[in-house]
Each structure stands twice: as structure tokens, then as C-alpha cells.
């Protein structure tokens, strides 16, 4: 299975642009898309996943599970559109831009990037900015 995008909410999202972002990150980081599922959900689903798999009883913006074996990038990530919406307001950015950033962030996690320390967070944020600029330039967003 290649890249699949699932939107479990009633909110409309630009699935083609999100798929383009995921494929760009994976390709530019030296990977090949294997089986990747990107699931866009609400707080209820992501909180349950966070609790069941990570023992954190709260909603978060994204949770990524990488299953890379061999040459192809495989995994799944969940993004809460509810958290994206509240974070966009908090950071003073458009919903679409925050959604794109977190999608890129999740794809970077699939490629092995980590954000456990301040230094790693800064490095990851720089990669996010790079890909955001590339995608915005290509799609005129």
C-alpha cells in the first residue's frame, strides 16, 4: 500500500497538498514511500491513542508510529485537527499552515528525526521551515 490519507472529521482539508508534503519530505530525506497512513482526526481519537500507546491522558497535535524495515518508509501518524485549530489561533497562523507544518513534522519523524531535546527540536523546526517554504513556493500558498 502506498501513501493513504484518511480524514475522520467533517472538516475539509487539502488532502492533495498534504500528500505532496509527505512525499516531498520522504523523497528529499532519502526515503522511498512504502506503506504510510496519515490519519487526520479529532481530540477524542488522538487522546485515546495517546493514552493507550504512550500512557499520556491528553490530546496532542500528532502521534507518529514508524515501522521502517529495509528500504521503504512505512508507518502511520495521527494528527488532531482540533489541536491544530487551537494551536493555529495560539500561534497566530492560518489553520492550513499549522496543519502543513505538523504534517511535515510527522513525516520527519517517519524519517527518524527526533524532538526530545531543545537542540533536536531546533534542527527539526529548521527542516519544517525548509519544506514549508518549498511547498508554499510550488503551490503559491
From Swiss-Prot:
Q: What GO terms are given for molecular function?
A: metalloendopeptidase activity; RNA endonuclease activity; zinc ion binding
Give the subcellular location: Cytoplasm
Claim: Metal-binding is one of the keywords in the record: yes
- Positions bound to Zn(2+): 105, 109, 115
Keywords, alphabetical: Cytoplasm, Endonuclease, Hydrolase, Metal-binding, Nuclease, Ribosome biogenesis, rRNA processing, Zinc
- Matching Gene3D superfamilies: Metalloproteases ('zincins'), catalytic domain
Q: According to the UniProt entry, what is the EC number of this protein? A: 3.1.-.-
Q: Which domain of life does the protein's organism represent?
A: Bacteria
InterPro entries for this protein: MetalPrtase_cat_dom_sf_prd, YbeY, YbeY_CS
- Cofactor(s) listed in the protein's UniProt record: Zn(2+)
The record's Gene Ontology cellular component field reads: cytoplasm
Group of enzyme by EC: hydrolase
The free-text cofactor remark is: Binds 1 zinc ion.
Q: Which GO terms describe its biological process?
A: rRNA processing
Give the similarity note.
Answer: Belongs to the endoribonuclease YbeY family.
Chain's role? Single strand-specific metallo-endoribonuclease involved in late-stage 70S ribosome quality control and in maturation of the 3' terminus of the 16S rRNA.
NCBIfam families per record: rRNA maturation RNase YbeY
Q: What is this protein called?
A: Endoribonuclease YbeY
State the organism of origin.
Chlorobaculum parvum (strain DSM 263 / NCIMB 8327) (Chlorobium vibrioforme subsp. thiosulfatophilum)
Amino acid at each position: 500500500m502506498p501513501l493513504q490519507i484518511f480524514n475522520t472529521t467533517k472538516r475539509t482539508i487539502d488532502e492533495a497538498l498534504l500528500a505532496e508534503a509527505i512525499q516531498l519530505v520522504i523523497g528529499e530525506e532519502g526515503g522511498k514511500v512504502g506503506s504510510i497512513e496519515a490519519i487526520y482526526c479529532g481530540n477524542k481519537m488522538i487522546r485515546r491513542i495517546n493514552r493507550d500507546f504512550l500512557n499520556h491522558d491528553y490530546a496532542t497535535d500528532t502521534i507518529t508510529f514508524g515501522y521502517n524495515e529495509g528500504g521503504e518508509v512505512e508507518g502511520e501518524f495521527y494528527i488532531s485537527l482540533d489541536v491544530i485549530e487551537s494551536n493555529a489561533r495560539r500561534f497566530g497562523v492560518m489553520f492550513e499552515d499549522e496543519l502543513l507544518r505538523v504534517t511535515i513534522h510527522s513525516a520527519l519523524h517517519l524519517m527518524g528525526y527526533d524532538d526530545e531535546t531543545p537542540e533536536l527540536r531546533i534542527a527539526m523546526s529548521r527542516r519544517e521551515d525548509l519544506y514549508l517554504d518549498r511547498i508554499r513556493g510550488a503551490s503559491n500558498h
